[in-house]
Amino acid sequence: MTNIRITEVFTQAMPVLEKLEEAGFEAYFVGGCVRDLLLERPIHDVDIATSAYPEEVKETFAKSIDTGIQHGTVTVLYGGSSYEITTFRTESGYQDFRRPDKVTFVQNLDEDLKRRDFTINALAMNRQGEIIDLFDGLGDLKRRVIKAVGVAEDRFHEDALRMMRAVRFMSQLSFSLEEKTRQAIINNHELLSKISVERIREEFVKLALGKDSRQAFKDFLATGLSEECPGLAGKKDQLSVLTDLKAGPDDEAVFWSLIAVLINLPADKISPFMRAWKNSNAMNQQVRQIVAAFDLLSRGEESDFDLFEIGQENLEAALKLAGLLGKPLSSQVLLDRYNRLPIKAAGELAIDGQWLIKEGIKPSPELGQLLRKALEGVVSGQVENSQAAIAEFLAI
C-alpha cells in the first residue's frame, strides 16, 4: 500500500465513504479517478466501490437513483453532489464481447479489481489515502505502460472495446503498450467488429484529440484495429500520415475532415462515410463544408464571395486542416481578406425579400436572383451596403 495526499474532489466525497463504513460496509475510490490523482491529472468525478448491495446503498442514503442497479450501480445524491456507487462484483459470459451475461455481487474488493481492464485502472484508495494495488498498477504508471489485468486475451474477449481504450489511453496519457497486451490486440482485433460503431467512434475521437495521438495512431494501424473501422479497411498507407503529424488535431470536425482528405473521399462520399460512423447531421454537414473550403483554398481560386460563403468558423477550420497537412496556405492573408469583407452574413445586407416586394418585385425566381446579385455586389465591394445604393445597382 502507498499513501498519497488526497485532493479536494476526494475530500468532498469522503463523507460518502464514511457513511458506508459507519453502516458496516467497505468502501473505496476506484478506477480512473485514482489513476488520475496519481498522475496529477484533472479529476471531474469519482467512482466508489463498496461491499454494500444496491438495496443496502439505497437504505444508507436518503436520496438515490437506480442508474444501473442490475449491474450494481446506484447514483447517490449527497452533500449537493452525485456519486456513482457500485457493489463489488464479478462478471462472466461475454457472448456479445461487450456486456457480461452474468453479474455476481461479491464481498471482496480483490475480486472486483480482477475484472478491470488495465492495471493502471485497477487501483483503489481508502479514505485514509492508502492505495490498494494488486497488479502493480503503480509500477506501470511509473513505467508509463498500458498493460491488461491478468491475461490480456481474456480481457479483450470480455470486452473488445478495451482494445480501442488501450490506444486511446496511449494518446491521452502519453503511455506505450505493454508487449503482451499489444500482441493480444493483434491476435484479436477482429473482435472490434462486434462492438457498436457509436462506442468505437467515442474512443476514436478521444484518441485523435489526445496529446500524443501520433504514437497511438501507429499502434491503431499496426495492430489491425483500423481494419475493423467503417471506411478505413485497406487504408493504412493513407492513414500513416497521422503518425507523422507535427501536432495532432484539436477539433473533432477538423479531425474528421483530415480523415476524409487522407483517404481521398470524393465530395459525394463524405456523407455516407460520416453516417457509417454514426456522426450527427450537424457534424456531417460541417465536415463537408470544411473539406470543400480546403479544396477551394488549395487551388488558390477563392473570391471574396467564396470566403463570405465559407464563413469564419469553416475558414479557420480549413486553415487548421491545411496546417496539419503541411499545405502552404497564406492563413493570415486569407483571414485578413475575410475580416475586411463589408458584411459577414446575409442578414447584414441592407435589403431583404420584403423590401424588394415593397419596391414592386413580385415573389418569383427573379426576387431570389436579385437578392443574390445584391449580396455578391456588396461582398465584392461593387456597391455600398445601403438601400439606395443597392436599388441603383439593381436598377429597380
Swiss-Prot record:
Its EC number is 2.7.7.72. The keyword ATP-binding applies. The keyword ATP-binding applies. ATP binds at residues 32, 35, 116, 159, 162, 165, 168. It catalyses: a tRNA precursor + 2 CTP + ATP = a tRNA with a 3' CCA end + 3 diphosphate; a tRNA with a 3' CCA end + 2 CTP + ATP = a tRNA with a 3' CCACCA end + 3 diphosphate. It is an enzyme of class 2 (transferase). Gene3D superfamilies: 1.10.110.30, 1.10.246.80, 1.20.58.560, Beta Polymerase, domain 2 (3.30.460.10). Pfam families: PolyA_pol, PolyA_pol_RNAbd, tRNA_NucTran2_2. CTP binds at residues 32, 35, 116, 159, 162, 165, 168. SUPFAM superfamilies: Nucleotidyltransferase (SSF81301), Poly A polymerase C-terminal region-like (SSF81891). Keywords: ATP-binding, Magnesium, Metal-binding, Nucleotide-binding, Nucleotidyltransferase, RNA repair, RNA-binding, Transferase, tRNA processing. Its cofactor is Mg(2+). Mg(2+) binds at residues 45, 47. One of its GO terms (biological process) is RNA repair. One of its GO terms (molecular function) is ATP binding. Catalyzes the addition and repair of the essential 3'-terminal CCA sequence in tRNAs without using a nucleic acid template. Adds these three nucleotides in the order of C, C, and A to the tRNA nucleotide-73, using CTP and ATP as substrates and producing inorganic pyrophosphate. tRNA 3'-terminal CCA addition is required both for tRNA processing and repair. Also involved in tRNA surveillance by mediating tandem CCA addition to generate a CCACCA at the 3' terminus of unstable tRNAs. While stable tRNAs receive only 3'-terminal CCA, unstable tRNAs are marked with CCACCA and rapidly degraded. Homodimer. A single active site specifically recognizes both ATP and CTP and is responsible for their addition. PANTHER family: CCA TRNA NUCLEOTIDYLTRANSFERASE 1, MITOCHONDRIAL (PTHR46173:SF1). Belongs to the tRNA nucleotidyltransferase/poly(A) polymerase family. Bacterial CCA-adding enzyme type 3 subfamily. This is CCA-adding enzyme. It comes from Lactobacillus delbrueckii subsp. bulgaricus (strain ATCC 11842 / DSM 20081 / BCRC 10696 / JCM 1002 / NBRC 13953 / NCIMB 11778 / NCTC 12712 / WDCM 00102 / Lb 14). The lineage of its organism: Bacteria, Bacillati, Bacillota, Bacilli, Lactobacillales.
